[in-house]
């Protein structure tokens, strides 16, 4: 039970989620489905049936172009090298949740790039991760690691720099021109995959592990070439809940869901503080109860007579 919500019935809300997600899956609100992985993040798939609500953008436009894709995917110069940003990604812990064959890391993670200056200054290139298939490809100089611009070799440092994370390709695959400061990468507020996982979670919370809930989970997994889960391996509601929570972290990474998921499950502080205060790039991750809420802007407190104090811990 999340503090402050003791009067809420989680079962009531799970029942509503189960019914509404079921209606969407059943086609009551139009035809939506889990599209082929390659289509979802392609230019032609930006308005496909999987995307229920997205922020639509326009390449190179000061008003309608978006900046977030540069942080997640980097901005390219005319030579095809990263010359700006590419600083927001997922940790190695996240990457290791996946099977190597899973499209969400095989295709959904940037595996090689060249940073202007930090790489070009020594004739090198960067890659991620430094194990498994991609490490073997680096050692064998298989494409794309046969790039003639990389004359001195490839480097990967997973433990001490914001330059080496599991950077997503979700947004770079769909944009028309990655050299633009403002791109046409659409931001997905709600995808059909989220609806299916909501249905799986709600079904489990109401009825425990059933074929219905595990099938929904597996629909998301197998679309990305991941191995399906076996119903027999889930002995109780808690075990399937953990699998669904993990799947949400995998499927919806960098789509703005994770913090809210951790808060609604009541494990935000536990999860964040398990990092030991710092992540690999020395970003402070220590959190206290005040971080469960954002601070109220000072201007709002001054102008709204109904607000006489800030949220706890933000005075």
Annotate the PLM regions.
Residues 23, 30-196, 205, 268-315:
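Elongated scaffold/linker segments in the mid-to-C-terminal portions of large proteins
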């Amino acid at each position: 039970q999340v503090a402050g919500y003791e009067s809420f019935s989680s079962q009531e809300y799970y029942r509503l989620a189960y019914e509404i997600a079921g209606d969407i899956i059943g086609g009551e609100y139009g035809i939506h489905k889990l599209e082929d992985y390659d289509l979802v993040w392609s230019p032609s798939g930006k308005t496909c049936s999987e995307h229920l609500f997205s922020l639509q953008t326009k390449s190179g436009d000061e008003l309608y172009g978006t900046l977030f894709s540069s942080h997640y995917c980097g901005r390219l110069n005319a030579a095809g090298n990263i010359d700006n940003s590419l600083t927001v990604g997922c940790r190695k812990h996240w990457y290791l949740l996946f099977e190597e064959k899973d499209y969400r890391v095989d295709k959904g993670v940037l595996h090689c790039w060249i940073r202007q200056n930090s790489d070009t200054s020594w004739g090198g290139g960067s890659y991620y991760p430094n194990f498994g298939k991609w490490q073997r490809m680096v050692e064998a100089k298989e494409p794309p690691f046969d790039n003639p611009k990389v004359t001195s070799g490839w480097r990967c440092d997973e433990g001490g720099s914001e330059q080496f994370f599991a950077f997503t390709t979700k947004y770079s695959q769909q944009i028309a021109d990655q050299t633009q400061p403002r791109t046409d990468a659409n931001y997905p507020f709600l995808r059909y995959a989220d609806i299916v996982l909501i249905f799986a979670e709600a079904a489990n919370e109401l009825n425990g592990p059933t074929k219905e809930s595990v099938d929904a989970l597996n629909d998301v997994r197998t679309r990305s070439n991941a191995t399906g889960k076996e119903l027999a391996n889930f002995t109780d509601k808690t075990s399937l809940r953990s699998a669904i929570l993990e799947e949400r972290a995998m499927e919806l990474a960098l789509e703005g869901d994770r913090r809210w998921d951790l808060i609604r499950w009541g494990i935000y502080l536990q999860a964040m503080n398990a990092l030991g205060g710092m992540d690999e790039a020395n970003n402070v991750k220590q959190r206290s109860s005040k971080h469960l809420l954002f601070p109220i802007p000072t201007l709002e407190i001054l102008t709204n007579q109904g607000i006489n104090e800030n949220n706890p811990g933000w005075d």
